């Protein structure tokens, strides 16, 4: 059994999707030790409660430096014997402490076909670009913003009359298929 921690900052829909894949046996040999979130009062917390997944709420502003924040996280991760970190809507850059401790063992999913449209509002950027396709990317995490080695991508069309909400929904459904599939391949 491989222990993973899932980091999320907001909705937590990808977190919930991964946990449900594990709970239904579609993703075997993996245990989610906890949800790690950097915010209070966000939907991912309610999702974790409903799924009976432990929750760690750690706000960076409660620490005097990013390094101290990450050292605190590392103590929790170590106590839970976490082998992999899976980012699912975690809206912070991962710092050197976590990167060094989990080198090559942190995954992220991003709602664009990287290297296009890094960072926030990738869906909005894709719509404004005039591109006819976008998608989702699973990649290893490095010190940059959405710059790690790409593992796998899946694309969908951008329709001429798409609203942001319609395209977000289509990309989100890609992510629900893509992320568990990649996790099953990469995390053993």
From Swiss-Prot:
Catalytic activity: N(1)-(5-phospho-beta-D-ribosyl)glycinamide + (6R)-10-formyltetrahydrofolate = N(2)-formyl-N(1)-(5-phospho-beta-D-ribosyl)glycinamide + (6S)-5,6,7,8-tetrahydrofolate + H(+)
GO biological process, one term: 'de novo' IMP biosynthetic process
Active site per the UniProt annotation: 110 (proton donor)
Annotated positions binding (6R)-10-formyltetrahydrofolate: 66, 91-94, 108
Keyword Transferase: yes
Keywords: Purine biosynthesis, Transferase
Pathway info: Purine metabolism; IMP biosynthesis via de novo pathway; N(2)-formyl-N(1)-(5-phospho-D-ribosyl)glycinamide from N(1)-(5-phospho-D-ribosyl)glycinamide (10-formyl THF route): step 1/1
CDD domains xref list: FMT_core_GART (cd08645)
Annotated residues for binding of N(1)-(5-phospho-beta-D-ribosyl)glycinamide: 12-14
GO MF, one example: phosphoribosylglycinamide formyltransferase activity
EC number in record: 2.1.2.2
Family annotation (SUPFAM superfamilies): Formyltransferase
A GO CC annotation given for this chain: cytosol
Family per similarity comment: Belongs to the GART family.
Role played: Catalyzes the transfer of a formyl group from 10-formyltetrahydrofolate to 5-phospho-ribosyl-glycinamide (GAR), producing 5-phospho-ribosyl-N-formylglycinamide (FGAR) and tetrahydrofolate.
Name recorded for this polypeptide: Phosphoribosylglycinamide formyltransferase
Native organism: Staphylococcus epidermidis (strain ATCC 35984 / DSM 28319 / BCRC 17069 / CCUG 31568 / BM 3577 / RP62A)
Gene for this chain: purN
């Amino acid at each position: 059994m491989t222990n993973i921690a899932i980091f999320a900052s907001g909705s937590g829909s990808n977190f919930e999707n991964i946990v449900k894949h594990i709970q239904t046996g579609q993703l075997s040999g993996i245990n989610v030790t906890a949800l790690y979130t950097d915010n209070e009062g966000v939907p991912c917390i309610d999702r974790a409660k409903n799924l009976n997944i432990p929750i760690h709420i750690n706000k960076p502003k409660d620490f005097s430096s990013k390094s101290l924040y990450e050292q605190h996280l590392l103590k929790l991760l170590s106590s839970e014997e976490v082998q992999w970190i899976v980012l699912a809507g975690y809206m912070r850059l991962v710092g050197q402490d976590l990167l060094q401790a989990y080198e090559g063992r942190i995954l992220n999913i991003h709602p664009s076909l990287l290297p296009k449209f890094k960072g926030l509002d990738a869906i909005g950027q894709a719509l404004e670009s005039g591109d006819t396709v976008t998608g989702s990317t699973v990649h290893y995490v490095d010190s940059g913003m959405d710059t790690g080695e790409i593992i796998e991508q899946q694309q969908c069309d951008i329709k001429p009359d798409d609203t942001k909400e319609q395209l977000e929904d289509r990309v989100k459904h890609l992510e629900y298929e893509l992320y568990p599939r990649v996790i099953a391949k990469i995390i053993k």
